[in-house]
Amino acid sequence: MTRAVEIVVVLSAVLFVGYGSLVLFTGGMREEFERFGLARFRRATGALEVLGGAGLLVGLLRTEVLVLASGGLAALMLLGVITRIRVRDGLVETLPALALMVANAFILTVALAAL
């Protein structure tokens, strides 16, 4: 794995651990999930983001874990993009989920090639 890919992995991991923590522990994210009509999934989503971010870091040492973490996070962000479209959010609101989906799909592709 190249240094550039490692940087993408670490950046994605930091973003997911940070954002997942916000989802779990802040009122603003509680309101967002209510707006999405997905309040009952807020804790699970936050936990998956934090665990996925941690999995990306472990995946730097274990490619199999990187495949699972990046694949799961790419799928989670696909659902995030679909949700943003469904509630008619604009590009600015949708772009973070879209960018993280693409980044993790890229990580997944690299990890699969390394197996």
Residue ranges of predicted features:
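Membrane-interface extramembranous regions
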Residues: M1-L115
